[in-house]
Amino acid sequence: MLNLTLAQLNFTVGDVEGNKEKILKVIDEYSEKSHIIAFPELSLSGYPPEDLLLQPHFLKECEKAFDQIIHHTRNYDVIVAVGLPYYEFDLYNALAVIHRGEVLGIYKKHFLPNYSVFDEYRYFRKGEEPLMIEVNGHKVSFSICEDIWYPDGVERQTALSGAELIVNVNASPYHVNKYSFKESFLKSRAEDNLCFVAYVNLVGGQDELVFDGRSIVISPFGKLVARAKAFEEDILTVTLDLGEAKRKRLLDLRWREGSYGREKVNVKRSVSLPDKEFFRGRIEENPKEEEEIYAALKLSLRDYVRKNGFEKVVLGLSGGIDSSFVACLAVDALGRENVKGVYMPSQFSSKESYEDAKALAQNLGIEFHVIPIKEIYRAYFNEFEKEICEITFDVADENIQARIRANILFYFSNKFRYLVLSTSNKSETAVGYTTIYGDMAGGFAPIKDVYKTWVYKLARYRNSISPDIPERVFKKPPSAELRPNQTDQDVLPPYEILDQILMLYIEENLSPEEIIRKGLPRDAVYKTINMIRKNEYKRKQAPIGPKITSRAFGKDWRMPVTNKFFK
């Protein structure tokens, strides 16, 4: 029997000292009940450290903290696996395996992702050697994140050399539908290699990335043995009968046949550890889609605010669905006492919008201010009229209202050190239906990667918990209220159609003609994609926000601003 502890923790990029202290605390508290304690990928530096990895003094701090962890383990009879940047003639994404003040081995990540949000080739050299140790007569191998996604990679090599447990440490970002696929594929890895697979993941928000945790252990029979909580720190200890791997291999000749002609991996070190208390696997519930997305957005917002030294946020409340939903999210993430809402009516704002914004603020119990912009707008208009003479009201006059509102919000930010939340959604950001330096402005954009139709679904989910958003907000046509009788559909296709086009174009990477063949209207498709192309300059200047789809604007989307291609 082997007791494995997966330390699913929320680390902070660059806080080497704080991250080290978290690691030491877990070692102190869990060494008596564990044979192996595994921490996530690059847990010492935080993930992703990006260009901090190019600073020698940062690497020196990581090395110093690593030495302190090694020293700390001298009095504990437990194996500790810690992720860190490791310099040895070159820089590696590494995993150090330590026992009683001695490094048993350093595993260096083999497969470096360089797609989507990942840039690991920019920083790291690929590792080449596997790492397998023997614990109480059982072979245990280690790997890092991307390595396990390759069916014939290091896990296969060590399994065919007798590994009964593969410990894979991760910093795997969340997006919708990823977890179910990941769990299914990890079960396949365990069944194919006829061994236990333990997958420990990071949890928390880091800029635009969200890490969902949900560390899991799978048996050689493909059975889920243990699963940690979603979107929360969790320490998961489980007792594994590693003899299961041997029993399974005696029944399944694939392992024997697959091992012929393969280069064998030798055991790096053997360690004998005392028997420890039995722990049955705990399987935490997997959240449903709306609950999962909401938890991701909430965690991302909370971590961005707190890790960057803010306490309070301010946002404009328009009486519409986007700002209403973001206000609810902010209250749930930060507490009502830390959220300020500002309603800024113009001559085009309706009485209903004021009533809905006020009702929302009262329901949430947040501080609520009303600052009319009509006279401010008139002062702008009068000054422009002196120079331009006759002015015909058009989109420039609409946008100046949004920019006045942004100035007011940033006054609160500057005066009281509140973080301004942008309430722009993915549908608007995609097609540029947002005012640059206006409603698009902010320090963080919590729904930047949430399609408009999803905003409605998530708001309904939030109202099922507490009905704080007035029902009228769901039913009225969406409008920026920048001119009389305006609705979003004056300019855009219906959101039900628009969002389908956006998903097919952005996430599934289809061409306009391929989208049309899916049954969507030709005019709407070409209009939408032309708007996407023309508004790249806006997206380049948008605040960051959490990635929750398979392809988000930001690190995931690297289109040129100057671009003539359109087919």
Curated annotation (Swiss-Prot):
<dbReference type="Pfam" id="PF00795">
    <property type="entry name" value="CN_hydrolase"/>
</dbReference>
<feature type="binding site">
    <location>
        <position position="428"/>
    </location>
    <ligand>
        <name>deamido-NAD(+)</name>
    </ligand>
</feature>
<feature type="active site" description="Nucleophile; for glutaminase activity">
    <location>
        <position position="145"/>
    </location>
</feature>
<keyword id="KW-0436">Ligase</keyword>
<comment type="pathway">
    <text>Cofactor biosynthesis; NAD(+) biosynthesis; NAD(+) from deamido-NAD(+) (L-Gln route): step 1/1.</text>
</comment>
<feature type="binding site">
    <location>
        <position position="178"/>
    </location>
    <ligand>
        <name>L-glutamine</name>
    </ligand>
</feature>
<dbReference type="GO" id="GO:0003952">
    <property type="term" value="F:NAD+ synthase (glutamine-hydrolyzing) activity"/>
</dbReference>
<keyword id="KW-0520">NAD</keyword>
<comment type="similarity">
    <text>In the C-terminal section; belongs to the NAD synthetase family.</text>
</comment>
<feature type="active site" description="Proton acceptor; for glutaminase activity">
    <location>
        <position position="41"/>
    </location>
</feature>
<dbReference type="InterPro" id="IPR022310">
    <property type="entry name" value="NAD/GMP_synthase"/>
</dbReference>
<feature type="active site" description="For glutaminase activity">
    <location>
        <position position="109"/>
    </location>
</feature>
<dbReference type="GO" id="GO:0009435">
    <property type="term" value="P:NAD biosynthetic process"/>
</dbReference>
<feature type="binding site">
    <location>
        <position position="538"/>
    </location>
    <ligand>
        <name>deamido-NAD(+)</name>
    </ligand>
</feature>
<dbReference type="InterPro" id="IPR003694">
    <property type="entry name" value="NAD_synthase"/>
</dbReference>
<dbReference type="Pfam" id="PF02540">
    <property type="entry name" value="NAD_synthase"/>
</dbReference>
<feature type="binding site">
    <location>
        <position position="423"/>
    </location>
    <ligand>
        <name>ATP</name>
    </ligand>
</feature>
<dbReference type="InterPro" id="IPR014445">
    <property type="entry name" value="Gln-dep_NAD_synthase"/>
</dbReference>
<feature type="binding site">
    <location>
        <position position="172"/>
    </location>
    <ligand>
        <name>L-glutamine</name>
    </ligand>
</feature>
<feature type="binding site">
    <location>
        <position position="399"/>
    </location>
    <ligand>
        <name>deamido-NAD(+)</name>
    </ligand>
</feature>
<comment type="function">
    <text>Catalyzes the ATP-dependent amidation of deamido-NAD to form NAD. Uses L-glutamine as a nitrogen source.</text>
</comment>
<protein>
    <recommendedName>
        <fullName>Glutamine-dependent NAD(+) synthetase</fullName>
        <ecNumber>6.3.5.1</ecNumber>
    </recommendedName>
</protein>
<dbReference type="GO" id="GO:0004359">
    <property type="term" value="F:glutaminase activity"/>
</dbReference>
<feature type="domain" description="CN hydrolase">
    <location>
        <begin position="2"/>
        <end position="242"/>
    </location>
</feature>
<keyword id="KW-0378">Hydrolase</keyword>
<dbReference type="InterPro" id="IPR003010">
    <property type="entry name" value="C-N_Hydrolase"/>
</dbReference>
<dbReference type="GO" id="GO:0008795">
    <property type="term" value="F:NAD+ synthase activity"/>
</dbReference>
<dbReference type="InterPro" id="IPR014729">
    <property type="entry name" value="Rossmann-like_a/b/a_fold"/>
</dbReference>
<feature type="binding site">
    <location>
        <position position="115"/>
    </location>
    <ligand>
        <name>L-glutamine</name>
    </ligand>
</feature>
<feature type="binding site">
    <location>
        <begin position="316"/>
        <end position="323"/>
    </location>
    <ligand>
        <name>ATP</name>
    </ligand>
</feature>
<dbReference type="GO" id="GO:0005737">
    <property type="term" value="C:cytoplasm"/>
</dbReference>
<dbReference type="InterPro" id="IPR036526">
    <property type="entry name" value="C-N_Hydrolase_sf"/>
</dbReference>
<dbReference type="GO" id="GO:0005524">
    <property type="term" value="F:ATP binding"/>
</dbReference>
<keyword id="KW-0067">ATP-binding</keyword>
<keyword id="KW-0547">Nucleotide-binding</keyword>
<feature type="region of interest" description="Ligase">
    <location>
        <begin position="287"/>
        <end position="567"/>
    </location>
</feature>
